[in-house]
Amino acid sequence: VSDAHIHRFGPADGPLVLALHGLTGHGRRWGALADGHLPEVRVVAPDLRGHGRASSLPPWTFEQIVDDLVPLLTEPAVVVAHSFGAAVAIHLSRHRPDLVRALVLLDPAIGLDPVLLHDIAEAGLARPDYADIAEARRDKLETAWADVDPGLLEAELAEHLVGTPEGRVTWRMRLPAVTSYWGQLARELVLPPPRIPTVLVRAGKSPFVTPATVAAFATLPHFTLHEFDCDHMVAQARPAETTDVVRSVL
């Protein structure tokens, strides 16, 4: 099996971090944080099934992604995860708590409003691609990337856009998988095992982490909450603060 979809950063003997991207994303997105802020850390950042260079085949479920991730972990890791990836991380911690040292959940998307998810999925099907890079850039700026460093946005466009047979551009992901995954985010909120230290970062300008979600996590004995003044792309918009949070559990 090719491992072109597994992005690795840092020294082979560094403390291990498994970094999980969000829906429509890709593993290389973690490169700026890993190389620029956590150079001594060994970061393993896979493209999740249906994204980037990973397998596009179903089943498109949290459980299948967990099964995909387990072989990457030869020892327990700190799992740093964004949005959809954070939901995956929680399921990983429940399935294999022996492999998770701590969780850092960046604006997690879990137990979301089904109406919201239906509308997002419909919008994605209605607009699967763009006329050109400029249109893709505008879409990113209108959907949570406005407070991200422009250089990171340009790197995202260069890495993650691919051409379509019709001469347009689209993200390097599989629309059937991504559309299906929006439904996974409507599944009930579940919590990690109580013994695992869990840090939740809520993005103040994002709608995903509700007071009810925070209240549920606050029942955990080893829970820490942070709120950053940013939109949904936490690691890209607030890299220094994100680094501090990761270091707190390393």
Where are the regions that the model predicts?
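Active-site loop/oxyanion-hole signature of alpha/beta-hydrolase fold enzymes
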Residues: 2, 9, 32, 44-81
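Conserved HGGG/HGGXW glycine-rich cap/lid loop of the alpha/beta-hydrolase fold
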Residues: 7-55
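The conserved beta1-alpha1 loop
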Residues: 18-22, 82, 202
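Gly/Ala-rich beta-loop-alpha elbow adjacent to hydrolase catalytic centers
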Residues: 81, 85, 89
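Flexible "cap/lid" loop of the alpha/beta hydrolase fold
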Residues: 94, 99-133
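Conserved alpha/beta-hydrolase catalytic His-Asp/Glu region
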Residues: 131-186
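Conserved loop-alpha-helix segment in the C-terminal half of the alpha/beta-hydrolase fold
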Residues: 195-231
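Catalytic histidine-centered segment of alpha/beta-hydrolase-like enzymes
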Residues: 230-239, 243
